[in-house]
């Protein structure tokens, strides 16, 4: 901001008029430091940053400013030189077309941005002529650079008309064939040349000088180009760009830098055959059809001879396939050799395998992949050998599958026993019985007014088989299904459908599996509880028994009891934080207690992380169900230890029934 204040303040004025000499010195330094930048751009940057060279350097070095910014770039000397040379060159250079590579005129395709400028720069031509008289050397240098980039701006319709109005199209037509060839080469040459020339000649005025001087000294030493940049700003006051520029620009240090480049590339380009090929193309781009027809007609014969050598190239390419078949037999021979080597290996393997029939099968299997490869190879007499060792190995491979079924036989008690079917009834009933035995359900949930165990969970024990049946509790069915699938073996080892485990065993199991808080109560999909069990529906969507109060929290309460009792298979840390979360979250949802995160708890999906730990903790506990003894780690941060079933997230939590409604925190999202 200090820059802006200064900018609005005195420094801008100082930079504007009194400091042009200072600005010019700064421009010199900048242009020397950044030869790729045109003086116009650097001047614009300086003026913008009130002639603070350090700021400009910082901007450029850190790429905070790019050359191609639209306004600053139009005054780019590259394109100015090209533009001016086009306006002047179209007038002067038709006589000098031979001295200039006309492919340089093709460049305007790339530089259509400059179409305006040739008109503007026809003015400086007078100034340019004066400048040429004043500085013939820079003009000569500019001529070299301009030849590479001179005629670009002929894109402008005015330039196109002025060029085409002249009857030099005929000259161009014979020349077209040459430049097409030249254009390809010199474009390559020109691009470096143009870059060097533009860097060296940082002002557009140099271009008109170049154009007129070009006939005189097309190959003149390049070094003076740097002086042309200075001359341009001072000499043609007619160009708007020159008026903008700070005038004192003795930037002559560039010359030694760019001279070798320009001499190499530009001199070559300048002295290449000259043709006005560009004009018709430019005209065609502009939409004027003068030279474009001639170009097309003449380019066609050029392209044809180009196309003709291609068939010549084809016969050349044809002998190559002949060579390839030669290479192919070599390749084939090589595999044969490999095969010869391999059969030996195979024989060795065959010998070693019967000798060592009891090697661990994986070792032999490693050998096998080689052998099947060998039968693929053409030498067939050796295939049987390769196959024979495979056969002895095969009887050994079945050993692995045998071992695997043994292992599986060990594992299925883990996985298959649950899969064989939990006794959903005894589990569910026992869990609820355990809750009753704990007598903790209402107290645990801190809702003394409502005894969930009596209302819901105990129906099954009351003898309503339907309630206790998995069919009655979709939660029970789903939960039972879940423990079968994800249930880790260790949790389920003690739980065979045949032998009903003691409550502790089932508690650990269910806490690990069906009770995954994420798997709402027995694996309800979470959305049941989210959508239908919200306090608005009063548990409504599901049967009351299946609500989180009934199905879900009953098992949780049993977990709570079991976890309170150290006898439960899982240490408290496993079940407690998850249950605490689940219960807290369910209560937050049902009684609208705000979540840890202040999201409105009473509404479905209200809390971002807090209400969705069901799935999270589900992911957590199921693996932990696999390792019931492994503590879950520090209790979930927001969730108090289990007996505080009412988490005290904030002071308001202590009156949960008011939470979602009176809590200002709940409504932050609403205003």
UniProtKB/Swiss-Prot annotation:
This protein's record includes keyword Ubl conjugation: yes
Function: Recruits the ubiquitination machinery to RNA polymerase II for polyubiquitination, removal and degradation, when the transcription-coupled repair (TCR) factor RAD26 fails to efficiently displace stalled RNA polymerase II. Also involved in telomere length regulation. Binds DNA.
InterPro entries reported for this sequence: CUE
Segments of skewed composition (Basic and acidic residues): 66-83, 95-124, 163-190
Family: Belongs to the DEF1 family.
Bias kind Basic residues: ranges: 1-11
Location(s), subcellular: Cytoplasm; Nucleus; Chromosome, Telomere
Superkingdom: Eukaryota
Cystine connections: none
Post-translational modification: Ubiquitinated.
Assembly description: Homodimer; may form higher order oligomers. Interacts with the large RNA polymerase II subunit RPO21; the interaction is direct and serves to bridge RPO21 to the Elongin complex in a manner dependent on transcription stress. Interacts with RAD26.
Residue ranges annotated for the CUE domain, each copy included: 22-65
The protein's name in its UniProt record: RNA polymerase II degradation factor 1
């Amino acid at each position: 901001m200090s820059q802006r204040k200064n900018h609005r303040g005195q420094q801008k004025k100082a930079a504007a008029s009194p400091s042009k000499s200072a600005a010019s010195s700064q421009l010199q330094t900048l242009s020397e430091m950044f030869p790729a930048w045109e003086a116009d751009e650097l001047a614009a940057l300086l003026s913008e940053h009130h002639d603070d060279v350090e700021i400009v350097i910082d901007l450029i070095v850190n790429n905070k400013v790019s050359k191609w910014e639209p306004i600053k770039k139009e005054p780019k000397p590259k394109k100015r030189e090209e533009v001016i040379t086009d306006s002047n060159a179209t007038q002067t250079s038709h006589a000098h077309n031979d001295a200039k590579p006309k492919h340089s005129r093709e460049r305007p395709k790339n530089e259509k941005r400059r179409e305006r400028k040739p008109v503007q720069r026809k003015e400086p031509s007078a100034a340019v002529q004066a400048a040429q008289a004043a500085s013939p050397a820079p003009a000569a240098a500019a001529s070299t650079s301009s030849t590479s980039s001179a005629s670009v701006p002929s894109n402008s319709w005015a330039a196109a008309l002025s060029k085409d109005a002249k009857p030099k199209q005929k000259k161009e037509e014979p020349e077209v064939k040459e430049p097409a060839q030249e254009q390809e080469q010199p474009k390559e040459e020109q691009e470096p040349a143009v870059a060097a020339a533009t860097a060296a000649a940082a002002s557009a005025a140099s271009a008109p000088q170049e154009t007129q001087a070009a006939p005189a000294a097309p190959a003149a030493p390049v070094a003076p180009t740097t002086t042309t940049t200075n001359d341009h700003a001072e000499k043609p006051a007619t160009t708007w760009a020159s008026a903008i520029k700070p005038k004192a620009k003795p930037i002559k240090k560039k010359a030694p830098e760019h001279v070798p480049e320009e001499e190499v590339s530009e001199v070559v380009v300048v002295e290449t055959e000259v043709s006005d090929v560009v004009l018709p193309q430019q005209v065609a781009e502009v939409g004027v059809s003068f030279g474009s027809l001639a170009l097309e007609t003449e380019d066609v014969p050029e392209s044809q001879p180009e196309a003709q050598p291609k068939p010549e190239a084809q016969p050349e390419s044809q002998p190559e396939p002949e060579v390839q078949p030669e290479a192919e037999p070599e390749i084939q021979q090589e595999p044969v050799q490999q095969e010869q080597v391999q059969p030996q290996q195979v024989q060795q393997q065959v010998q070693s395998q019967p000798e060592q029939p009891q090697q661990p099968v994986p070792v032999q299997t490693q050998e096998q992949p080689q052998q099947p490869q060998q039968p693929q190879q053409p030498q067939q007499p050796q295939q049987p050998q390769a196959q024979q060792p495979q056969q002895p190995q095969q009887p050994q491979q079945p050993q692995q599958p045998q071992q695997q079924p043994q292992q599986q036989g060990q594992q299925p008690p883990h996985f298959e026993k649950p899969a064989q079917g939990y006794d959903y009834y005894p589990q569910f009933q026992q869990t609820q019985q355990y809750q009753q035995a704990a007598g903790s359900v209402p107290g645990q949930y801190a809702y003394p007014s409502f005894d969930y165990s009596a209302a819901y969970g105990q129906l099954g024990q009351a003898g309503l088989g339907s309630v206790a049946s998995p069919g009655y509790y979709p939660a029970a069915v789903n939960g039972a299904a879940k423990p079968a699938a994800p249930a880790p073996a260790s949790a389920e080892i003690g739980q065979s459908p045949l032998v009903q485990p003691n409550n502790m065993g089932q508690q650990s199991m269910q806490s690990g599996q069906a009770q995954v808080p994420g798997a709402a109560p027995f694996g309800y999909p979470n959305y049941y509880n989210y959508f239908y069990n919200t306090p608005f529906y009063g548990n409504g969507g599901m049967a009351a028994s299946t609500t989180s109060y009934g199905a879900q929290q009953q098992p949780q309460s049993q977990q709570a009891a079991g976890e309170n009792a150290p006898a439960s298979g899982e240490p408290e840390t496993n079940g407690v934080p998850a249950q605490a979360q689940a219960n807290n979250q369910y209560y937050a949802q049902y009684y609208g207690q705000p979540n840890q995160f202040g999201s409105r708890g009473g509404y479905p999906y209200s809390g971002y992380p807090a209400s969705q730990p069901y799935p999270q903790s589900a992911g957590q506990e199921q693996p932990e169900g696999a390792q019931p003894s492994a503590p879950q780690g520090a209790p979930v941060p927001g969730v108090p230890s289990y007996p505080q079933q009412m988490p005290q997230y904030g002071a308001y939590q202590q009156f949960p029934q008011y939470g979602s409604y009176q809590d200002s925190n709940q409504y932050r999202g609403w205003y």
